[in-house]
Regions:
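Short carbohydrate-recognition loop motifs
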Residues: 44-65
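Beta-strand-rich interaction surfaces with strong enrichment in secreted/lumenal proteins
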Residues: 65-72, 150-157, 198-199
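Short, solvent-exposed beta-strand-to-loop segments that form ligand-recognition rims
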Residues: 177-197, 201
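Ligand-recognition surfaces built from glycine- and aromatic
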Residues: 193-218
Length: 218
């Protein structure tokens, strides 16, 4: 099957639904190597939900896992996803990667649900994060530009529940909105400008995903 939608999106051999709202990859086929590429993680399916568990022991450091949509190149447009992590301290880091080349070269927007409703206002400002690996890790961005590439989320989502994320990507900017809010919780200058794949992203602990939608720029 060949689908051509715009210069920002090229798909070949991908099981997905294409509509006016964009492309909806079939998450239930995450373990089908013709449709998805799972990197440094184990993926399981429960109905429409994908649970992604990164390899490695979280007690000994960060371990990033990805589930990447095969044969898809994305540069600009809108990404949407429903996510669920955990509210326990350092229980989950989860989000979406784009411009993916490999396990260490990508841009990502990810969330720290355990910071959503933290009693410490400074800690709440770490709820959502943009990175552009390998150069712009969260450590580098926090040290070099504190408070610029991460932010709090208002209104506060349930740290242990499902929440909806919309990520708008242009050549210059990345903006993030949560649960249908018209006010972005994070707007940053884009630090990576590569075309690449789109994927589910986890660090250290398992997370759940559903309803991925990719809407390329017209």
């Amino acid at each position: 099957m060949m689908i051509r939608h715009s210069a920002s999106l090229c798909v070949a051999g991908l099981s997905a639904v294409l509509s006016a709202q964009g492309l909806t990859p079939d998450l239930t086929r995450v373990n089908d190597a013709n449709s998805w590429r799972v990197i440094d993680a184990d993926a399981s399916v429960e109905g429409p939900v994908v649970r992604l568990k990164p390899h490695g022991d979280p007690a000994v450091g960060s371990h990033i896992g990805l589930a990447v949509v095969q044969n898809l190149k994305f540069s600009e447009g809108t990404l949407e996803i429903d996510l669920r992590g955990g509210g326990k301290e350092k229980a989950s880091f989860l989000g979406l990667a784009f411009g993916v080349t490999d396990a260490t070269t990508f841009e990502a927007v990810y969330f720290r649900p355990f910071r959503f409703a933290d009693d410490d206002p400074d800690a709440r400002r770490h709820a959502v994060q943009y990175v552009a690996w390998p150069e712009y890790t969260w450590e580098k961005l926090r040290n070099d530009k504190p408070g610029v590439y991460e932010a709090a989320i208002q209104p506060v989502p349930d740290p242990a529940g499902w929440f909806h994320a919309r990520i708008d990507v242009t050549k210059q900017k990345v903006s993030v909105s949560i649960d249908g809010s018209t006010q972005p919780c994070l707007v940053v200058d884009r630090l990576g400008h590569r075309e690449g794949e789109v994927g589910l992203w986890v660090d250290s602990m398992p997370a759940a995903f559903r309803n991925l939608r990719i809407n390329p720029a017209k």
